[in-house]
Regions:
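Short, contiguous acidic/charged loop-to-helix segments that flank catalytic cores in large enzymes
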Residues: 60, 76, 120, 145-151
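Feature representing long, continuous alpha-helical segments
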Residues: 2, 60-64, 91, 95, ...
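Helicase-core coupling region on the C-terminal RecA-like lobe
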Residues: 1-68, 123-125, 161-167, 171-194
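Short, glycine-/Ser/Thr-/acidic-enriched flexible segments
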Residues: 57, 91-93, 119, 134-137, ...
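Conserved P-loop NTPase motor core of helicases/translocases
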Residues: 25-31, 102, 116-118
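Conserved helicase motor "Helicase C" RecA-like lobe of SF1/SF2 P-loop NTPases
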Residues: 68-114
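Conserved SF2 helicase motif VI
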Residues: 142-170
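A short beta-strand element within the Helicase C-terminal
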Residues: 115, 123-135, 145, 170-172
Length: 194
């Protein structure tokens, strides 16, 4: 099972033995990030296909992750339409993230898609950064408002869509303390935090 789809398969599809179409990116065992690491955070990005990154200032963290990924992918291989995408919960996050990206002075990054889950449905990127944007209980209620129960399981459609948009790597950012109030996000944080 592809790393980015294992959680949705287990939690939302009741392990219905979904089999991915055998594509080359699904068979890769390591991420192709050849540049030397700047620090331990780079090492984490290189080692994990799915990773939860705790953050209070998500826009700054997302911009920093974009800078690091761009450095690893390299200007020759980077393609804004395929390499990286950012999914957000709230439209106002787009402006916050773009403002932080402008500070990086990397013009190629300005062309990446940053949009809500609904707008990402049907498209994919090699790397997806999902900025959850949850700072309080009200935000968490909004984030999980599309959940429903089926056969005794809680299914979160937005989370399912977001987690299955990544071809190679899924990075999620958010407020750990608030997200842990929800059983599904608590499990994600437990599985994918380092």
């Amino acid at each position: 099972m592809h790393h980015c789809c294992a959680f949705p398969n287990a939690f939302f599809y009741q392990q219905e033995q979904l089999q991915p179409v055998p594509c080359s990116h699904q068979l890769e065992t390591a991420l192709d990030y050849p540049e030397p690491s700047e620090d331990v955070f780079d090492d984490q990005l290189k080692q994990h296909r799915v990773l939860f990154l705790p953050a209070d200032d998500e826009a700054s963290l997302v911009a920093d992750v974009l800078r690091r990924l761009y450095r690893q992918i390299g200007s020759e291989r980077f393609d804004a339409a395929h390499s990286i995408g950012v999914i957000v919960t709230y439209r106002h996050q787009i402006a916050l993230i773009r403002r932080e990206m402008m500070k990086l002075d990397i013009p190629a990054l300005l062309d990446i898609s940053i949009d809500t889950v609904e707008r990402y449905q049907g498209s994919q990127r090699d790397v997806i950064i999902y900025s959850l944007g949850v700072q309080n209980a009200t935000d968490l209620d909004f984030l999980t408002s599309n959940c429903f129960e089926e056969d005794g399981r809680v299914i979160d459609r937005k989370l399912n869509v977001a987690m299955t948009r990544a071809r190679k790597q899924l990075l999620m950012t958010g407020n750990r303390d608030v997200l842990c109030r929800n059983a599904i996000f608590q499990e994600i944080i437990h599985r994918y935090s380092v």
